[in-house]
Amino acid sequence: RGSXLTTHPLRNIKDLVYMGXITIG
């Protein structure tokens, strides 16, 4: 999943935010 960060940074960030929202909510 490391190379995905360089290939699709926006997608990775969106996934991170999504997971964060699930953890908080």
Curated annotation (Swiss-Prot):
Glycosylated. It is an enzyme of class 3 (hydrolase). Placenta. One of its GO terms (molecular function) is aspartic-type endopeptidase activity. GO terms for biological process: proteolysis. Keywords: Aspartyl protease, Glycoprotein, Hydrolase, Protease. Its EC number is 3.4.23.-. Belongs to the peptidase A1 family. This is Pregnancy-associated glycoprotein 67.
